[in-house]
Amino acid sequence: MATYSSNDFRSGLKIMFEGEPYAIESSEFVKPGKGQAFARVKMRRLLTGSRVEKTFKSTDSAEGADVVDTNMNYLYNDGEFYHFMHPETFEQHQVEEKTVGDSAKWLQDNAECIVTLWDGRAIAVQPPNFIEAEITDTDPGLKGDTAGTGGKPATLSTGAVVKVPLFVQIGEVVRVDTRSGEYVSRVK
């Protein structure tokens, strides 16, 4: 892989740091009046998702991470692993439950997800930005009951719970933003 100087660090760049892949979220180059220049970097550890702040000298460098984001279709969950398939090569990957994490509540059969692979192993799963799911459970909205925020919790067919407007009923299909977990619209 390529080697990057700390001057080349940009948002979105994936590097190897302490033997693990990291994604740089922001980089600020600082040149103090006295002393050596440095880069103040905020990065996300791809294996766990934790965020780290690190300072690199201007002479430091890091190797690029051999990390690939691949579009894959979600197939099924066998209780222990989530199974994904590449749509063109039909190559299948099984992903541990802890790697999928909170994304599991947004997975629907055959949904196209972005699976991040490192050394052929899946290390992160990103569900589609928007899903359409049926409401399986919610309280009936009473007319004139808008004293509060005007929303009510609803359980989707995927198991996720989102806040929806009072007019939405059981059996309706709604569009949800998976990044924020918010209701977007009804699907007709």
Swiss-Prot record:
The keyword Protein biosynthesis applies. It is found in: Cytoplasm. May be beta-lysylated on the epsilon-amino group of Lys-34 by the combined action of EpmA and EpmB, and then hydroxylated on the C5 position of the same residue by EpmC (if this protein is present). Lysylation is critical for the stimulatory effect of EF-P on peptide-bond formation. The lysylation moiety may extend toward the peptidyltransferase center and stabilize the terminal 3-CCA end of the tRNA. Hydroxylation of the C5 position on Lys-34 may allow additional potential stabilizing hydrogen-bond interactions with the P-tRNA. SUPFAM superfamilies: Nucleic acid-binding proteins (SSF50249), Translation proteins SH3-like domain (SSF50104). InterPro entries: Elong-fact-P_C, NA-bd_OB-fold, Rib_uL2_dom2, Transl_elong_fac_P/YeiP, Transl_elong_KOW-like, Transl_elong_P/YeiP_cen, Transl_elong_P/YeiP_CS, Transl_elongation_fac_P. SMART domains: EFP, Elong-fact-P_C. The modification N6-(3,6-diaminohexanoyl)-5-hydroxylysine is found at K34. One of its GO terms (biological process) is peptide biosynthetic process. CDD domains: S1_EF-P_repeat_1, S1_EF-P_repeat_2. One of its GO terms (cellular component) is cytoplasm. GO terms for molecular function: translation elongation factor activity. Pathway: Protein biosynthesis; polypeptide chain elongation. Keywords: Cytoplasm, Elongation factor, Hydroxylation, Protein biosynthesis. Its main location: cytoplasm. Involved in peptide bond synthesis. Alleviates ribosome stalling that occurs when 3 or more consecutive Pro residues or the sequence PPG is present in a protein, possibly by augmenting the peptidyl transferase activity of the ribosome. Modification of Lys-34 is required for alleviation. Belongs to the elongation factor P family. This is Elongation factor P. It comes from Pectobacterium carotovorum subsp. carotovorum (strain PC1).
